Amino acid sequence: MGRPLIESSSNDHVANFNRKTKKLIDQALEHYNGRLPEQLENFSFENFVEVLDTESSVVNRVFEVLVREVAGSFRQRKRAHMPRTNTTAQVVQRQLAPSISTVFSRDSNDPLVDDMDQEYIL
């Protein structure tokens, strides 16, 4: 009869992700190659895929940051569609919660190093 709807939807998301990822990589490669001296060979998409190491801590960190940024955008968009009363209640609740600056404020007249600590520094 056909594929189940969930599988079809999942495949659509994978295809959409692949299109978006390819576009982002192509744009980054174009920017990168545009800055290369003429005597150097351009870095291609094929080179990128071949060399990309999914076990690299740097690559994993880049993707963690990317996921965090996209999730933040998603939450902001979702918050924009929330009813006004929920948003107002959340703002009031956040204003009532102490912030780090109010909990750990320092008197500007206090020295950064105590007299007792000064002995150990010298």
Curated annotation (Swiss-Prot):
One GO CC term on file: nucleus
Protein name according to UniProt: Uncharacterized protein C8D2.11
